[in-house]
Amino acid sequence: MDPAAPAARMTSSFTINISTPSFYNPPKKFAPVVPPKPKVNPFRAAEEPVPQENSAGPGLRRAFVGKVGQIPSMAPPGGDPEDFVLPPPPPNEEPMSPPGSSFPPPPPSFGDDGPGSPLGLFPPPPPPEFSEPFPPPIEESFPSPPPLEEAAGLSDTQDPPASVPPPPPPLPSPPEPAPPVLCEAPKPAPVLPKPPPPSAFPKPEPPQSVAPKAQSSIFIPKPSPPSAVAPKPVAPPPVAAKPSGPGPFVGPSAAPPTHTPAPPAPAHTFSPKPVAGPTFAPKSASHTFMAKPSAPVFSPKAATEPPTEAPQERFPASQSSPKLTPAAKHEAPPPAAKHEAPPPASATRAPGFSFAQQRDKPRVLEKPRANVRDLVPEPPVETRGERTLGPQAEGGRSFGAQPIGGKDTKPLPEGLRNQTPDGTHRVGGQPGTHRPTPHQDQTSGSQGLNMKEVEELEMLTQQLMQEMDKPTPAAEAHTMELCGFCGRGLSRTETVVRAGEHLYHVTCFTCSKCEQQLQGQQYYESAGKPLCEECYQDTLECCAVCEKKITERLLRAIGQAYHPSCFTCAVCKCSLQGEPFIVDDNKLPHCVSDYHRRYAPRCTVCGDPIAPEPGRDETVRVVALEKNFHMMCYKCEDCGCPLSIEADDGGCFPLDGHVLCKKCHTVRARAALG
């Protein structure tokens, strides 16, 4: 092969590896599938005849499906049988490689659903809502498209599919089945034209002949170092041969396709599958199938097949053409592996299980509830936009779960959300009919309480309810109220009396004087003790004025109790509540003005009572010679000059009972002496 070729394409006889999903609990093996008779393709007449010349671009190498013992007539110059390396078939995948393709090589399908049939692009329908699979004639009438070589080269690295997709229908006039052309010893290499640049879409390539084969093998040309195709690991397990009926047939691919089907990549639309021990069983051609969770499904379609819009809507087109990382290029198998003959189909199928049986029961899919540790994704081998081959068991068929092809690259939360509590798993939003298995019963305990724990919880609840119904005496005494008088507990069944902030027995709540029961009667509290109305009246004080009981507001003054209305001035009878008052010698209250008018000393000069000045409570008076004077009336009797209250020259100089100033005093004294 030309080492400068950016990508290598190959086509081979269509081998369908029918295998059960990896989450089947018991391993199942099935008998060989009886190849059905070829059917007439209704779309054949409207398409162009199968061209016999290679329309692929230069540099693209391809292999063709031929008749028994017939070598392809067209072979590219420089074709060497040594360039074609037939990697061992995978233990759990059925590669599909129709010859022609109208789009660039898609990436290897990790976790592919199986044969590249037109149904491979459809998302899994909800089996619980449909009692029968979809009508097979609709999908079986489509001619098998030329699969991509990456699908065949990488299909062996994916886990067993979780569904049973139908094989593609045969073409109108298939020749007799025969072993594949390139399964023999080194023969003339099939025509492998060089591909155009990776960014361009290579032209479809016509097949040499349309020949369904009973037992065919998948072979991949040896990838060159720059090739983007990931070869298979060394010594993978054998792959069961496919019946000639459902084998892929090369449809007319001379003309470019009228549409560009994007290879579906439901890696981000389906939840990861549990890494449980897988078993392998033949796949059914039924229309009820479930897509693998984390790998694009490459379903071969004829180049002239009408476009199908439903698969493109269900599957994201962002991953339709992922690329292979260089890590996958270094795992090329030795050239000797290309001539290994696949074992018979009975090696991987249980006896007694035929292809027709799966068609009758297409939706009987068992999927155990995945353990949480099984759902933890392995270290991802897939990057955004690029895919690499994951580890795979070497040397013999491995029935244990292996993280291959980016199967478990889906995060755990989405996988857990797609798993319903009743054991039904949902893939891509569609429920799958899965019956619980013993493995599910074992793992269900980690998600909820088992029966023993539920019974224990119910028993504890019943015990708690009984304890609440029958409280202990200590708890009862602690929660009960106590009587305010006797201090004993108050039963919930007897009548109690609430007075203020305390509760009392009926017999205890009585008048503190006459011991009359006060239940239902008006009572008064005096010094913290209840009193009846009569006894309460006896404790009341009488007014000092009217001598009546003071039942309301009480005004206490001069050591006596008064009604506020009875405490008035003895002269003017004005209320003294809140006003200053003066009590006379008879203990009668007087207002200040009346008291001074009645009892205040009078001025010797003017004769008026000496009362406090307005706005003042104090009375200012001058006493001289045992006489009372107003401050303004304290003057010299002779000259009338004001006198000072101080003992100085301006003060009073009395003479013969007269209040005189110093000057007048001198005059009168001299006159008396003279």
UniProtKB/Swiss-Prot annotation:
Domain LIM zinc-binding as annotated: residue spans: 481-542, 543-600, 601-671
CDD domains linked to this entry: LIM1_Zyxin (cd09349), LIM3_Zyxin (cd09435)
**Per the record's keyword annotation, is Repeat included, yes or no?**
yes
| SMART domains named among the record's database cross-references | LIM (SM00132)
Q: Which GO terms describe its biological process?
A: cell adhesion; regulation of transcription by RNA polymerase II
Where found?
Cytoplasm; Cytoplasm, Cytoskeleton; Cell junction, Focal adhesion
Quick one: where's region Disordered?
Answer: 35-447
Q: Where is there biased composition of kind Low complexity? A: 110-120
One GO location term (cellular component):
focal adhesion
* Pfam families listed in its UniProt record: LIM
- List the SUPFAM superfamilies: Glucocorticoid receptor-like (DNA-binding domain)
Compositional bias per record (Basic and acidic residues), positions renumbered to this chain: 328-341, 358-387
| Superkingdom to which the source organism belongs | Eukaryota
GO molecular function per UniProt: DNA-binding transcription factor binding; metal ion binding
Is the keyword Transcription in the record?
Answer: yes
- What are the Pro residues biased-composition ranges? 86-109, 121-148, 162-180, 187-209, 222-240, 254-266
> What does the annotation say about its assembly with partners?
Interacts (via LIM2 domain) with hesx1/anf1.
Q: Which family does it belong to?
A: Belongs to the zyxin/ajuba family.
Biological function: Adhesion plaque protein. May be a component of a signal transduction pathway that mediates adhesion-stimulated changes in gene expression. Suppresses the transcription-repressing activity of hesx1/anf1.
Q: What is this protein called?
A: Zyxin
